[in-house]
Amino acid sequence: MDINITLIGQMITFAIFVGFTMKFVWPPLRKALEERREKIAEGLASADRASRELEVAKRQSAEILREAKAKATEIVENAYVRAHKVDEQAKEEAIAAADKIKSMAIAEIEQEKVKAKEQLKQELVNLAMAAASKIIAASVDEKASKKVLEDFVEKV
């Protein structure tokens, strides 16, 4: 095995090349690899954080939705209760108005009844006076008196 100068030259050149690469090429390459590893780790951490935040947001949105549904149900129930109260109040007012009208009608009927009785009494008095004066005028004839009284009774 002959070691000649070419082989030694190649070994020296290779050693210089390795030294040059270790000094000038390897550090930026290592730095780039390290930066890439950090970016990947940061991306994974960011994705993990985003996943957790998404989970929290989902829980919060579900809670907000639940609260909104509960509030909507409460509003509907309150509206139903209020409508029922208004309905009952309207019914009570209508019944009160009907009772008032009925009472007024009954009072008016009673007044008309009293008035009619008074008129009837007045007419009865007038008829009795007329009959009495006819009886006195015709007191001579008993038959005529009887007839006048019968006519009077028929009128009444």
Curated annotation (Swiss-Prot):
Cysteine disulfide partners in this protein: none
Subcellular location: Cell inner membrane
Transmembrane segment boundaries: 5-27
Keywords per UniProt: ATP synthesis, Cell inner membrane, Cell membrane, CF(0), Hydrogen ion transport, Ion transport, Membrane, Transmembrane, Transmembrane helix, Transport
Keyword Ribosomal protein: no
InterPro entries in the record: ATP_synth_B-like_membr_sf, ATP_synth_b/b'su_bac/chlpt, ATP_synth_F0_bsu_bac, ATP_synthase_B_chain
Tree of life domain: Bacteria
Record bears the keyword Oxidoreductase: no
Membrane disposition: Single-pass membrane protein
A GO CC annotation given for this chain: proton-transporting ATP synthase complex
GO molecular function, one term: proton-transporting ATPase activity, rotational mechanism
Reported function: F(1)F(0) ATP synthase produces ATP from ADP in the presence of a proton or sodium gradient. F-type ATPases consist of two structural domains, F(1) containing the extramembraneous catalytic core and F(0) containing the membrane proton channel, linked together by a central stalk and a peripheral stalk. During catalysis, ATP synthesis in the catalytic domain of F(1) is coupled via a rotary mechanism of the central stalk subunits to proton translocation.
Homology family: Belongs to the ATPase B chain family.
Quaternary data: F-type ATPases have 2 components, F(1) - the catalytic core - and F(0) - the membrane proton channel. F(1) has five subunits: alpha(3), beta(3), gamma(1), delta(1), epsilon(1). F(0) has three main subunits: a(1), b(2) and c(10-14). The alpha and beta chains form an alternating ring which encloses part of the gamma chain. F(1) is attached to F(0) by a central stalk formed by the gamma and epsilon chains, while a peripheral stalk is formed by the delta and b chains.
Name of this chain's protein: ATP synthase subunit b
